[in-house]
């Protein structure tokens, strides 16, 4: 029979939540979901019927995952002091908490970026350009642009546009005007709702993200409403003028947007500091909606007469 102290120690260990290793948290794999935009051109250009195009798209997706992680590490290096002062989630980031030193983080980035650029070169020169621009944009955002109102939103949105353009040049197809405008509008919606959630989930939000002192919940609501309407208008025009068969995806898209906004409304009530992406990857309904949208799109476009 164990002494009471030992039993208490074992109970404490069993009740302690499992913690993801610091290296994995540093890379933020949950955020790789955003790189699904890289696969958009593969679907809408009907290039998924080509094995070569599929392989190039998957390579582009993986490279962007690596580049995105490098960008997050750069951001965490610059934000380590403010992250340490954060009242909740950010203070536990590996660099801010001291689990991974700045020196080690710099070494990781210094090795990863040249390797990723080399891999991008083997996909295509244009794809290398897309990756390089994304890296520069990410660095500029971390250093300065995230403190500039409005510009910060468009910088976030531009990152999504570069993902889509990268996916297009990786398989040597032209990025359509409709896809460009729809992606930009959708990304602005995501950026505005993200800022809105930050304003609601932190009592002194502007102390930890300076740009928030220039925003209000009402303003973010206004921006997100404009962006989501623009997204539906441009997506609808694309369907009507180019791919009428994709009308079958509209109910799924509507559900996805409604569900996303619903999830964003939950965070302030529950007092959590989850990012929007964290919520999406943990929500079964959003996962099913995304899979359903992709499946319907592929089936409809595959059955479309050549």
What spans do the regions from the language model cover?
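C-terminal membrane-associated helical module and adjoining short loops/tails
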Residues: 1-24, 143, 161-306
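Topogenic membrane-insertion module of multi-pass membrane proteins
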Residues: 2-88, 97-110
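Short, amphipathic, aromatic/basic-enriched membrane-interface segments that mark the entry/exit
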Residues: 24-30, 94-105, 122-127, 145-153, ...
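Long, highly hydrophobic alpha-helical transmembrane signal-anchor segments
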Residues: 34-55, 145-177, 219, 224
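Generic alpha-helical transmembrane segments of integral inner-membrane proteins
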Residues: 36-40, 58-69, 110-118, 122, ...
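Residues within alpha-helical transmembrane segments of multi-pass membrane proteins, especially transporters
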Residues: 43, 70-71, 77, 81, ...
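Short, aromatic-rich membrane-interface segments at the entry and exit
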Residues: 52-57, 125-131, 149-153, 174-180, ...
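Multi-pass membrane catalytic core of lipid/isoprenoid biosynthesis enzymes
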Residues: 80, 85-131, 177-186, 225-234, ...
